[in-house]
Amino acid sequence: MGSPGASLGIKKALQSEQATALPASAPAVSQPTAPAPSCLPKAGQVIPTLLREAPFSSVIAPTLLCGFLFLAWVAAEVPEESSRMAGSGARSEEGRRQHAFVPEPFDGANVVPNLWLHSFEVINDLNHWDHITKLRFLKESLRGEALGVYNRLSPQDQGDYGTVKEALLKAFGVPGAAPSHLPKEIVFANSMGKGYYLKGKIGKVPVRFLVDSGAQVSVVHPNLWEEVTDGDLDTLQPFENVVKVANGAEMKILGVWDTAVSLGKLKLKAQFLVANASAEEAIIGTDVLQDHNAILDFEHRTCTLKGKKFRLLPVGGSLEDEFDLELIEEDPSSEEGRQELSH
């Protein structure tokens, strides 16, 4: 063991070295040493509690961090997902009108005049243009000599669609149109919520056809026509006759649509007027029923077509009435009951 004097000498020597290690410019200032916080260990002291809690803390801290990151991700993702859902809802709402119809140019010779004007009027109705918009698109669609006919009209006449139409037809002639098999004036008196449905299809689109013996013509809603044809205006033919509803008003008709109706495996040719005549998507009137010699039995709720008997579903009936299927009986001796397209 060393003597107390030797220990004192070593301590003074260390203090002397520390003093000489300080920069000359830094005067020695005597500062009181701040006491260490009571919660921290002193030098050389180990707290057993910290050793025991260290592994636990090393697990909890990353877990909490991951939790906060996950919550932040969810908070950022929810508005985006909500936005996507809202957009999807908007698209589904817009599904009924997916097309922005634009008239093709007309120079007087590229298209038969009355067919072009009919197509233009259909586009006007589908797009719900006002009068000013209709006239603007009319002028912008004209080319060449057709535009010359328009420019030679007075400003007042240019603002009247009927006058412009008459001038174009007079300038380029109207070829004879094929006569329609329909009468000149027809009264459309549907059953107004009464009647029976047939379940079928047009193309690949499922349709509930209202069988209405009170309607002289068959009608489909423009939305159904657009869904089946993808808005193909070439599928519409002009309708020159007049159809009046029960109150005497004239029905606005976009055109005549020749298509095929599928009832089970049976296909029938049918001609529909495309018009927003009622809330029904499709109405089968007496014209189609008579063309195919349909036999309606309202007592037993059946409709017989080409040897096939189909169930009629009551309007406003319960869902239980709409069980699978339509075809309930077939006459095996009937050659007309085959799958070919019936005329």
From Swiss-Prot:
Species in which this protein is naturally found: Homo sapiens
Membrane topology: Single-pass membrane protein
Subunit structure as annotated in this protein's UniProt entry: Homodimer.
GO cellular component, one term: membrane
Keyword entries, A-Z: Aspartyl protease, Autocatalytic cleavage, Disease variant, Glycoprotein, Hydrolase, Ichthyosis, Membrane, Protease, Transmembrane, Transmembrane helix
GO biological process, any: protein processing
Record gene name: ASPRV1
Function: Protease responsible for filaggrin processing, essential for the maintenance of a proper epidermis organization.
Pfam family, one: gag-asp_proteas
Record EC number: 3.4.23.-
An MF annotation (GO) of this entry: aspartic-type endopeptidase activity
Protein name per the record: Retroviral-like aspartic protease 1
Statement: the UniProt record of this protein carries the keyword Signal: no
Outcome reported for the amino acid change (mutating residue 311 to P): In ADLI; impairs filaggrin cleavage
Residues the record marks as carrying a glycan: 276
Membrane-spanning parts: 56-76
Location of the active site: 212
Compartments where found: Membrane
